[in-house]
């Protein structure tokens, strides 16, 4: 039987809908990827797992794009996820161009700056676990990315992402993240569980890696400050820390 043009178009549309819904349904939540819930008692994801999860999510969703922004002291790649609508992600270079023009009021005339501000998108940088023992932020980063791309949020994520590009760095200190998780896993379930490592959680600087922000000696600091002061000039920078026992 010969198909009519209308039937052919209908079948094509249905096929595209099925393919699109299949891609959305295939977005893997962190707990399924890790085999445990994020934040579950006595369970921590290390940097290798966190990086692998972001890579998987970027393969499954058109709302996230990954970049390598540098390397840690021990040569772990430092990743950053750009999260927004597919349309916004396709124009990242334009949004960067606008932030560069708006970064200094001496560079761009007022009228042009107003037009650029109207056209551009708000850039929000979120960095996690600068201090590696404050482990919750790096763990949370996976859930945050998943919730934003799937819209499983208490706010309208789709509406927000129309106007915002989120830059998410899941770990500011990948080496320290790995050290902390390896140490905890080694002694979990023993009388030493919860004890501090007998060494600093950065190859050189330990807790003082945040105090490197005026010297820029460490490659991790250089990677993040390059995003801040040379690459993106975000309007908001949220550095996630942690308090508690």
Model-assigned labels for residue ranges:
Residues 70, 79-85, 91-101, 112-121, ...:
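Surface-exposed loop and adjacent secondary-structure segments within mature catalytic domains
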Residues 37-44, 127-134, 210-214:
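Second-shell loop/turn segments in exported
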Residues 27-44, 48, 219-223, 227-245:
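C-terminal accessory segments enriched in acidic
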Residues 55, 59-62, 146-154, 214, ...:
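Sec-exported extracytoplasmic/periplasmic mature domains
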Residues 27-82:
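Mature N-terminal segment immediately following signal peptide/propeptide cleavage
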Residues 1-12:
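Bacterial N-terminal signal peptides that target proteins for export
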